[in-house]
């Protein structure tokens, strides 16, 4: 296994639990990436959220499939969850530390802390799970092996502040549409404050980044820097991470009174999500940024309630590398030109934490099967895991871009269902039923992680 991120951690666990010895190579702490802060396994470098928890949402369905397949990474996320409304968010420090300990104590797993600068010998079954922050040397060897230039986009992480430094006389606790408990801190803005904040974002100085050209940079649309959203239009942020709809401060009056709602609702709202179990740290939701650190502090302290905010981490931008998977990989995640080499995680062109875990589960499962002389598997297209792996292996080459889990990847239902919630529920029911059949046919998953 090359890489101990989400995918590599999951893959290593699946191979070890299959009774096979696995060598896990990780370059941290010998060499750090631009976005990592520790040498722990499965470090979450951007958000601490795996996305919606409900299984009638695409991310939630993917998580549920992985639970049923015995994913250790998702099981540990459940164990280290923090309040986040309808999302699965984790205490990222405890989460990564627990997975690191789990692998370090496994008798079948041996760690090698060094940079892998080239692909291993061709007679070894290998899983490439180096993620979007693959080192330059290995990326160059991959280019030689595939005969293709890698693809890339620019991604960023959000700042984190101390919860005690938020002025709660201006902010309030609530979840959107009152889902779950009041899990988010919300900082409301009026129109004047919002426009002033946007102007400051547009004028702020950005950090210098290798290969980054603002005019020609490629971003992942689902994770745009906040300053890029500001550039796209006056109201873009208000219809994105700063949307006020569904958020109400009880101090504003009766939420059920339409006239009160119309008169009092904020023009925009900045949300903060809990980072740790103790609620001491909070990240600014949707505030990925490439501003210089001094500029981040100056501009973000314009947000009502954050005037005295203490920042424990500023946002950073980094280059994300991924393979042109449709030209290289099968749905089993094997390279077509070298079947005992598999790829997993975001380097394959899937987007999101749960999708990376799914790739790790499948690559690890198939690596073990290859060693035992068994036929590799793929999952039904009607499951979210199967839909993602089939998409990245079959999408048109040339304009391939990372894909997050979504219901549009699944085959259409036999009957049209107009109601969206009912339709998504039907997708879920079919996916979980087909997953059960696949598990029974191939004796897959359901491996519990230890206490």
Swiss-Prot record:
It is an enzyme of class 2 (transferase). Disulfide bonds: none annotated. The keyword NAD applies. Keywords: Cytoplasm, FAD, Flavoprotein, Methyltransferase, NAD, NADP, Transferase, tRNA processing. Signal peptide: none annotated. GO terms for cellular component: cytosol. GO terms for molecular function: flavin adenine dinucleotide binding; tRNA (uracil(54)-C5)-methyltransferase activity, 5,10-methylenetetrahydrofolate-dependent. Its cofactor is FAD. FAD binds at residues 3-8. Its EC number is 2.1.1.74. Belongs to the MnmG family. TrmFO subfamily. Catalyzes the folate-dependent formation of 5-methyl-uridine at position 54 (M-5-U54) in all tRNAs. This is Methylenetetrahydrofolate--tRNA-(uracil-5-)-methyltransferase TrmFO. It comes from Synechococcus sp. (strain WH7803). The gene is trmFO.
């Amino acid at each position: 296994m090359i890489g101990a991120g989400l995918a590599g951690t999951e893959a290593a666990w699946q191979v070890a639990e299959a009774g096979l010895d696995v060598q896990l190579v990780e370059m941290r702490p010998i060499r750090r990436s631009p976005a990592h802060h520790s040498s722990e396994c499965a470090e979450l470098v951007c958000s601490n959220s795996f996305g919606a928890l409900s299984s009638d949402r695409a991310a939630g369905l993917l998580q549920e499939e992985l639970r049923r397949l015995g994913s250790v990474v998702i099981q540990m996320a459940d164990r280290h969850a923090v309040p986040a409304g309808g999302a699965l968010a984790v205490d990222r420090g405890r989460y990564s530390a627990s997975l690191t300990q789990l692998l370090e104590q496994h008798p079948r797993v041996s760690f090698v802390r060094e940079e892998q600068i080239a692909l291993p010998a061709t007679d070894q079954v290998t899983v490439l799970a180096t993620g979007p922050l693959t080192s330059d040397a290995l990326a160059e060897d991959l280019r030689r092996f595939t005969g293709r230039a890698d693809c890339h986009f620019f991604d960023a992480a959000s700042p984190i502040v101390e919860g005690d430094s938020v002025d709660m006389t201006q902010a309030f606790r609530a979840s959107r549409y009152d889902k779950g408990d009041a899990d988010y801190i919300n900082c409301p803005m009026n129109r004047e404050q919002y426009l002033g904040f946007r102007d400051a974002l547009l004028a702020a100085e950005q950090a210098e980044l290798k290969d980054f050209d603002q005019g020609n940079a490629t971003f992942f649309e689902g994770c745009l820097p906040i300053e890029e959203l500001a550039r796209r239009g006056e109201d873009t942020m208000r219809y994105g991470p700063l949307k006020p709809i569904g958020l109400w401060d009880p101090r504003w009056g009766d939420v059920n009174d339409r006239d009160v709602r119309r008169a009092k609702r904020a023009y925009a709202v900045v949300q903060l999500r809990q980072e740790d179990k103790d609620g001491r740290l909070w990240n600014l939701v949707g505030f990925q940024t490439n501003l210089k650190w001094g500029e981040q502090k100056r501009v973000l302290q314009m947000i009502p309630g954050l005037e005295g905010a203490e920042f424990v981490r500023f946002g950073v931008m980094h280059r994300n590398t991924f393979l042109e998977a449709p030209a290289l990989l099968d749905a089993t995640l094997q390279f077509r030109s070298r079947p005992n080499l598999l790829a997993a995680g975001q380097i394959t062109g899937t987007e999101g934490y749960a999708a990376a875990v799914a790739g790790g589960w499948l690559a690890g499962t198939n690596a073990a099967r290859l060693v035992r002389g068994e036929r590799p598997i793929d999952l039904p297209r009607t499951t979210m895991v199967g839909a993602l792996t089939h998409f990245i292996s079959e999408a048109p080459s040339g304009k391939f871009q990372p894909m997050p889990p979504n219901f549009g990847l699944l085959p259409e239902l036999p009957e049209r269902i107009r109601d969206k919630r009912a339709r998504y529920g039907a997708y879920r029911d079919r996916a979980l039923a087909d997953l059960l059949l696949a598990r029974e046919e191939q004796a897959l998953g359901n491996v519990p992680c230890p206490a």
